[in-house]
Amino acid sequence: MKLSFHGQSTIYFEANGKKVIVDPFITGNGQSDLDASTLKVDYIILTHGHGDHFGDTIELANRNHATVIGSAELGDYLTTYHNVENVRPMNIGGKAEFDFGNVKFVQAFHSSSLTDENGVPVYLGMPMGLILEIEGKTIYHTGDTGLFSDMKLIADRHPVDVCFIPIGDNFTMGIDDASYAINSFIKPKISVPIHYDTFELIEQDPNKFKQAVSVGEVQILKPGEDVSF
């Protein structure tokens, strides 16, 4: 399995011949190494509706006829206002099998909206974390979230091989809470810090996160680099 990081919270993987992207914030993301106008994907998975996660979803979905997997509210928004053909609505606690693997959404503590052309926030359902079961590996993408103790429950139910976790602070966990989550609750084999350095408000030194983590291995990835299993 190819599993790579592409700036902010965007991850991409290929499994069983399918190409999948999570939170495709490409255009306007100074960290991204991808080109939304040429990227080919079969599936798009969204943790929530904020612009730095929703990103290029509409273009990618319509050009590729890709299936968008996300909250029911996000699905309704895409089909009603943007003519996206293929949507799979899900919600927290729900698990579904796809031809690339299994997807389960779990809790995240954040918010979820998108600002329309009139500057009005549109509610897009609950923010969610994401459990992926792919080719014998369990991947936990926490989404944007603060620290919460049920991360331990999530990891108890789904022992984690790779955890993508935000460290940017201000809008999500910072390094102190993220490292606590890894050390005390999630305890993955591999931790990958995300959601930092994209904007001034979330500038962080990922090496401080690495120094604070005492469980498993921390892999600090540059955009375009693969997780090393």
Curated annotation (Swiss-Prot):
Domain of life: Bacteria
Keywords: Hydrolase
Key word Iron-sulfur present: no
InterPro entries, sorted: Metallo-B-lactamas, RibonucZ/Hydroxyglut_hydro, UPF0173, UPF0173_UPF0282_UlaG_hydrolase
Gene3D superfamilies found in the cross-reference section: Ribonuclease Z/Hydroxyacylglutathione hydrolase-like
MF annotations from Gene Ontology: hydrolase activity
Keyword Transport found: no
HAMAP family for the chain: UPF0173
Family listed: Belongs to the UPF0173 family.
Protein name: UPF0173 metal-dependent hydrolase SSP1060
